[in-house]
Amino acid sequence: MLILLWGLGSERPLIAVGEELRRLGAPTRLIDQRDILHTQVFLGVDSGVGGTIHTRNDRIDLSTVTALYLRPYASCALPAIARAGPNSAEWRHAVTVDDMLLSWSEMTPALVVNRVQAMASNSSKPYQLRQIQRFGFSVPDTLLTTDPSAALTFWERHGTVIYKSVSASRSIVSRLRPEHVVRLGDVASCPTQFQQYIAGSDYRVHVVDTEVFACEICCKADDYRSPGQHPIKIRSCRLPQDVEDRCRALATVMQLPVAGIDLRQNLEGAWYCFEVNPSPAFTYYQNATGQPISSAIARFLARNSQSMDTSGQSFKETDWRAHLSIGFSP
C-alpha cells in the first residue's frame, strides 16, 4: 500500500492532505513538481502499465501505488522551465514527465483523485452546464459567442449579465457595465461566455465520496474569490436534504470523488448551479470554517487504498525493454 501525491509541494491542499495522511499513519510519497528536473519516469507496457519514478532521493515502484491524489500544474510554467524556453532540454523533459505521469494515472488500477478524463468536462463550461441541468439544478441563461451584436442583444434582453471563461482557465467573473461597450468588438477574436446575472446568496459545496461540506459566502463583489475592497464572510451551513443529495449524485455521476460545486440560491428560493470544480482549492474554505475537508480526503484515500490490489502491474527493470521503455534525463 502506497499513497502517491503529485503536484507542487508548496501548494496548500496538497500539504493539508499529506499532513492528514501522515496523521493516519498511511505510507505516503510526494512527487514534487518543483524538483521536476531531477525526476525521471520509466513505464513498461504488457498486460497493464507499470514502472518506476526516480526522484533526487527516492525510487518508487508504481506497482506499489494503491492511491493517487493529483494536483499537477503545467510543469513548463515553472520559472526554471519557462526561462529555458520551448526548445530546451529542460522544457522537453518537463513535458515528457507530465505526459507520462498523466498517461499512467489514466491506466493504473489504483484509486485516482481525480482522473483526467473525469475532469475534462470542466474544460467546456457550456458542456458541463448541460450535465448539471440533469440533476434538477437551475442554470443561468448562457450565450457563448464571437458575435458582438449577439452579445449586445443578450445584454439588452437580461439587463444585467456577467462574462467569464469558457474553459478551465480561471477568470474573474465580472458584470458587464456601460464602459465595456467599446470592448464588445473584442469577442470576435475570443469566444466569450455571457450569462444572465442571478441575484442571491452564494454557496460552496465540497463533496468527498459521500460526505458533503457546505458553506455560505456573503460578499458583494461580482466574484467573491477576488473581493477587492468588499468584505467577505464564509460560514459553515447545512443545505436542504434534496440539494445535498443532488450535489452528491452530481459528483458521483461525473466520477469525481472530490469536487467543489458552486451554487447560488436566488431571491425566490431556486437553487442554481454554476459549475463543478474537479480540483478544488478547498483549504480556502476549510481555513475559514474549520470543516475537516482534508481529513475526509485523506481518509477516503487511505480507506480505498487498503482494499486496492495492484500486484498484477509489477514489472522488472530488466524486462522493460521487451515491452516499452521510456525515460528522459536532461
Tell what function each PLM region has.
Residues 21, 154-244, 250:
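Phosphate-binding site of ATP-dependent enzymes
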Residues 277-289:
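Glycine-rich phosphate/pyrophosphate-binding beta-alpha loops
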Residues 224-271, 294-305, 309, 317-329:
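A long amphipathic alpha-helix within ATP-dependent nucleotide-binding catalytic cores
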Residues 121, 125-172:
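Loop-centered beta-sheet repeat module
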Residues 161, 213, 259, 272-274:
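Protein kinase-like catalytic core scaffold
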Residues 8-20, 29-138:
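Conserved N-proximal alpha/beta basic substrate-recognition cap immediately N-terminal to
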Residues 1-4:
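Extreme N-terminal starter segment of soluble prokaryotic enzymes
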Residues 45-47, 56, 207-211, 266-269:
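Short acidic-glycine loop/turn motifs at beta-strand connectors
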